Amino acid sequence: MKIREVTDCKKEYLALLLLADEQEDMVDRYLERGTMYVLEDGGVKAECVVTDEGDGILELKNIAVKPDCQGKGYGKALVDFLVQTYVGQYTVLQVGTGDSPSTIPFYESCGFRRHHLVKNFFTDHYDHPIYECGVHLVDMVYLQREI
């Protein structure tokens, strides 16, 4: 397993990015200013994008694992990689996600704790309703962990 930074042609991984953020113009808002990594294990299995949000905060804007590779530790490996890579450069790793039964437990298992909520984020910023595991996403839940 190898994790490497992607510095150009980030849109080559659009199909994977859209697994985590299904509206392309929302991905475009952070993709170019963000730092992107892919996890390879006999081919690309997962990706993540992080951005500098100031005040010592690194935000995980997008993390996705190919559907047939989920549950194999690739997502956790990316989070662990980010913590190891950015320790000393940032004090907090944060992520914003929907209040979904598939994402919140994953982030909590990676050491994140709920921090704050942005009301109506998904209804205000997406042009269509977003559903995850049958749950209509409305509010953005922010979780943080120290690094």
Model segments located where?
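Conserved GNAT acetyl-CoA-binding A-motif
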Residues: 86-98
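Acetyl-CoA-dependent GNAT
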Residues: 4-67, 79
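Conserved catalytic-core motifs of GNAT/GCN5-like acyltransferases
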Residues: 94-96, 108, 113-134
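Short secondary-structure capping/turn micro-motifs that flank functional sites
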Residues: 33, 101-102, 122-124
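Conserved N-terminal entry element of GNAT/NAT acetyltransferase domains
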Residues: 1-9, 141, 147
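Conserved acetyl-CoA pyrophosphate-binding loop and the N-cap/start of the following alpha-helix
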Residues: 69, 73-81
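Short hydrophobic/aromatic beta-strand or adjacent loop that forms the aromatic wall/cage
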Residues: 34-36, 137-142
